[in-house]
Structures are given as C-alpha cells and as structure tokens.
Amino acid sequence: MESKPFSLPSQSATVLIGTQFGDEGKGKLVDYLSDQYDIVVRYQGGANAGHTICFDGKSVVLHLIPSGIFNEKCVCVIGNGVVIDPVALLEEIATVEALGYEVKGRLFISHNAHLIMPYHKRLDSLSESAQGDQKIGTTGRGIGPSYEDKFARKGIRVVDLLNAEVLQEKLRENLAQKNRLFTTIYDGEEIDVESMVREYEEFDKIIDPYITNTQLYLNRQLREGRTVLLEGAQGSLLDVDHGTYPFVTSSNPTSGGACTGSGIAPNHIGKVIGVCKAYMTRVGNGAFPTELFDETGEELGRVGHEFGATTGRKRRCGWIDLVAMRYAVAVNGITELALTKLDVLDGFEEIQVCNSYTLDGKEIFDFPTDHETLSRVKPVLTPMKGWMASNADARNFEEMRPAAKQFVEFLENELEVPVTFISVGPGRNETVFR
C-alpha cells in the first residue's frame, strides 16, 4: 500500500498575550492585526476583562467577543476555555450589530465553553465580601465560581443549552447545592429554580446559530491554510499557575492556555506576541513592586485614563518592571513585543525603569514566584531621559524622538526580544511598525 506523505503543521497561528497585570492595550493591537488574519480566537477568561477599541471616532469596549469583529473579513471564535455569561454575550452582540456590523456567520461559540450562571455572580460577591482584608479584588462577574464548577465537574456548558432535559437536570442539581450555601453559610435567600430553568431554555433559541465544535472548526481551517490569531485576556502575571497567586485570575492567560483553551496544538503556533505598556498598572489587590504612591503615579493615571474597562475601578500605576517582564518572556516563549501607551510618557522629563530588586538587602534579578517574597522586594530603578514631545505623527521608528527610541532600544536589549509594534497614541493609525 502506498504511504501518504507527511504534512507538517502550518505554524500559521499567532498568540497575542499580555506580559503584565492585564490592561496592556491588547484590544488595539488585535483590532489592527485582524486585517492580517482570517480568524481571531478568544481562549480564556470571561466578561471580567474589557478590551477597548478606538476607531472612526468611537470607543467600544468588548468583554467576550474577540476584537476582530470590527474587521468584516474576519471570523471570530469564543473558545472552549472561556466562561460565558449569556446575558453579557447577547448585550455585546446587540452592541456590535447596532454599530452596523454583521455578527451571524462571523461569530462561533464553542459548544464546550462553560456558562456563568446568576448563582456564580452571587457567590463571587458573597465570597469576596467575606474575605475582609484578604480580598482578591475580583470583578464580581462570577468568573471564579464558574471555573470552580468546571474543575469540580459540575459546570453547565454551552452544549447543554441544546438539550432541555439535560439543562433542567443540571440546573436543579446545581441550585440545590448553591441554595444550601446561600441559606446556611451566607444567611441569604434561595434562587428560584423554575424561573431560572425557563430563562435559560430561552437562551437556546437565540444562541443556537452561533454554537459549533470550534476545536474541529479551527483545526480544519488551519489545514486549509487559514491564519489564526489567539487573543488572551488579562495578563501573564495574573495567570492562576504562573502569576502572583493567590492574587490572580482563575484561568491561564499565558501562551499554554491558548492551546488548551482553543484546541489548537502547540506545533501550529508560529509567533507569540507579548503586549506591554510603557509603564505598569494593576487593578485590585496583590504585590506591585514598582507601584508609585506619589504625584507621579497620579499623573500616569490621569494621562493614561487608567480606569478599568469592566469595573471602572482606578488602576494602580507604577514604572515598567523588567524583572517581571523577563519572567513573562520566559514563561510564554515570547518572540516579539508590542509596546503600548508610549504617548502617556510624553510629558515626563525623567522616566524610571526597574531592572532588578533588592530582597533583604541583596540585589536579585529573578522574579519571585511566591507572593509573600514578592511583597517584600524593593525596586532598583534606572533613570532615563524623557522626550517631552509627542511621537503621534511618527509612522516609522526613525521619525520618533531620540530619547523615545533610546527607551525602546533599552527595553529590547534588556529583554532580548525585538519590539516590533509601538503605539504612540490612542488612534488606530497612531502606530509605528518595525
């Protein structure tokens, strides 16, 4: 029998991830790059992460639908690693359609993705309130409790919406347990089972056209030569395994999560693009070695409009931390960097960069992987001259201010990764490619 020739993986998939604590500006980059890809995939997280896209004088925040939806040639996929709030999803679909963009036929939802239910949101809020000083700083969107049910093998998946009997049985089983928690542990009220069954049976009629086996779909598309961009939510330092545990999210924003959350094998990944701000921010609690508590930190927040796209919470601001970023580069296998919000630094006479820490009086260069140690480090800051002018008109690297170029080159040399994309303003075209 004649043997078939081996076909090598295309390596036509790219992973785009945040290298910091989230809010790095991934939405702008995905929106820009979606012209170059056939499919954009969201692979983890839920409606706890907001991606802001600016175009045609509009500013739009998406939480679940991939940012590529505003490129009419692009197909968008919500992968199996995402936890989906059906109410939030339908609101987003309506928002996108109201802007004149077709969604049906361009958005596919994994049948294996888990659902966020009303009881998950209530548990999230009650559990966070009970933590007192040890609060994680969750968004209260039910993300953590939904992932808890997923890994406890009690979760309700998108595919369950298609079978009324299975849905009813799972809802009743889950609510029996959750109502006991509400009444005995939290001294609250029960959720009515029958009203929730009726509500979620209605979702089937609306969401059914979008549901598909996205693992099979994506692998078929790759075999046929399509290109795929995998879009992460949050940032590497919030990864449940590799982040500042326990002050982390409940999923894996790192590059490994792109494979498990989409069903695309690692040998299809050709590039891993790491997105980083020219400074750093963090929402919620947890160690933040370069955090600024003075007027400089306030100024970064004011100029950078640092308020959460999902919660509206004020973000904590600090200088860029290359110790943390070296760790993110290693954990993710980052092949190139995208630098965002460089324009926020336009008005600073001096900029600081953290290249090492001190711990108990000793200089260290490696990122501590336990939160207790990380909370005790002090940043060693290197001052750099600011450029005190806008780079918004620059469209290539040579047109940028000399001090701004020196800043970019310093980051490249220290991280040993090329910076190929520089955002010099909020607008879609205020971008420098190298």
Swiss-Prot record:
GO terms for cellular component: cytoplasm. Disulfide bonds: none annotated. Pfam families: Adenylsucc_synt. This is Adenylosuccinate synthetase. It comes from the Bacteria. Its cofactor is Mg(2+). InterPro entries: Adenylosuccin_syn_GTP-bd (IPR018220), Adenylosuccin_syn_Lys_AS (IPR033128), Adenylosuccinate_synth_dom1 (IPR042109), Adenylosuccinate_synth_dom2 (IPR042110), Adenylosuccinate_synth_dom3 (IPR042111), Adenylosuccinate_synthetase (IPR001114), P-loop_NTPase (IPR027417). It is an enzyme of class 6 (ligase). Its main location: cytoplasm. Mg(2+) binds at residues 23, 50. Belongs to the adenylosuccinate synthetase family. One of its GO terms (molecular function) is magnesium ion binding. It comes from Chlorobium phaeovibrioides (strain DSM 265 / 1930) (Prosthecochloris vibrioformis (strain DSM 265)). PANTHER family: ADENYLOSUCCINATE SYNTHETASE. GO terms for biological process: 'de novo' AMP biosynthetic process; IMP metabolic process. Homodimer. Substrate binds at residues 309-315. NCBIfam families: PRK01117.1, purA. GTP binds at residues 22-28, 50-52, 315, 341-343, 423-425. It catalyses: IMP + L-aspartate + GTP = N(6)-(1,2-dicarboxyethyl)-AMP + GDP + phosphate + 2 H(+). Binds 1 Mg(2+) ion per subunit. SMART domains: Adenylsucc_synt. IMP binds at residues 23-26, 48-51, 139, 153, 234, 249, 313.
